[in-house]
Amino acid sequence: MIRFFLLSFCLLLLSGIEAQTVGLLTNTPAAFNGYTLVAPTGATRTHLIDNCGRVINQWDSEFRAGEAAYLLNDGSLLRTARQSSTVFTGGGMGGRLERFNWDGELMWSYTLANDTAHHHHDMAWMPNGHVLIMAWEYRSPEQAAAAGRLDDGPLWPPMIIEVVPEGTEGGQVVWEWHAWDHLIQNANPDLPNYGNPSDHPGRFDVNYGEVSSGGGPGGPGSGTGGDWFHCNAVAFHPGLNQIVLNSRNWNEFYILDHATSTEEAAGLAGDLLYRWGNPAAYGRGTSTDQVLYTQHDPHWLTDEGPTSLGGNPDATMLVYNNGNARPSGPASTVDELTLPLQPDGTYFLADGDAYGPASLDWSYPQFPFLDFFSPNISGAQRQPNGNTLICEGNGGQLFEITPDGDIVWEYITAYSQFGAVAQGENPIGNSTFRAYRYAPDHPAFDGRDMSPGDPVESNPLPFDCQLYPAAKDTTAQGLPTEKIELTFGPNPARSILRIESNFPIRWTLRDIAGRSLMDAMITSRHHTIDVSNLPAGAYLMVVAQEHGSHSSTHKILIEP
């Protein structure tokens, strides 16, 4: 990334123009052409820009951003907004959801900001028109002590509610989940939640983790509040009917079952299906096993672009790993991993072990360095062409990389809580929670005037930016869209496994915990794999077209 900033700076010096500080820095033919939604933290305006950084649309609110914002299929904007509180003061303060139509008119709002619960950071729009809302839930020092907490003070555990919007304001809560219903502790044997946390990985150790309060936008501060988990992301997988919830303070993310009633979610059925990032949080590891460091934005790749290894996008997660307290030093990475998803929707866990995988499928950069580091907020989004759009949130730096890590598009958020940033001035307050790019054929743009306006920044420099439109079908860059015709056998296999395919494919053989054992790209119709050196047992064969447009996972048995 440094080389592009230096190149841009040098070009401006050569042309006699003052240095560029915000807006578009780089756009190349290798970037995925689309429209990027940018909602600066604390600002009241949200922009949709093209790849040249020019405004396509904008929405104004009376309320400052409460972090997340999304463009829905009908062209409406769903955003979070800030509401003050006398109880909750943590970073990522929200409290209000707003939905504006394409023309900027407020269609609907919902407020969750009282003395017992307060929305923060994120929400997830569901295909049925419901919305999942993440919130802090207040628990008094007395309640914390009664649950076995040894420290004094209140706790704000996470809760999730599902709301059906009604009219122009409000809605009906039809489902809810509370972390408080899923606690375990080994300090007081007289309490009903007594047990060994390592024997109950689906529950939260009530004595794990410190609390925080206050802090700047998007990150926890220090103080005497009860921000215990500091969850900062929630996402929904409609096919699996599962929810992912992210905890910055615990350095792990969780997957919950949504195929439950509220009553069931309060019991064993509401325990965690899966957790990953920090096995020490559930007594199955130490600090040396930790792999996530104050991370943000874990989400499935189902509705985005191809996976890096051609695996099953329903079992592949992308996460921005911020890197605070990383042993090698503060540095961020964007990490991709394959979850040990089983056919029944559960996740494999060996007795006494931590949840897999033990290794990543892909990580950018390969070697973390301080020049790429955001201590809070941030996110990443896989593009249909296999690139990844990264939001290095603290400085409002957005950039797109190829699978090999080459930067092909760069932009610095040109708007802040103080308004448009003047070109040439140092941007202050332009931190950006996340950024999302939408393809030109996204349904939100059907029938819309997509003519570009001016750049977002004030006093923009003269520039000659060219767009590089992609083909209409952006799902696989013109590759055949029919599914793979695949046969393999024998199954069970002993020494040789044969694969036949009508398209070039990439295959990956994984153990049942999701660890990659071997992989290859094959272009011939017939292919043979030597499995004679593998121990007998069950394995997963992940097969995908060359660019990941179609994929499937198969169970393979190997006999001695």
Predicted regions mapped to residue ranges:
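Sec-dependent N-terminal signal peptides
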Residues: 4-13
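Sec/Tat signal peptide C-region and signal peptidase I cleavage site
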Residues: 15-19
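Short, surface-exposed linear motifs at loops/turns and structural transition points
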Residues: 8, 474, 505
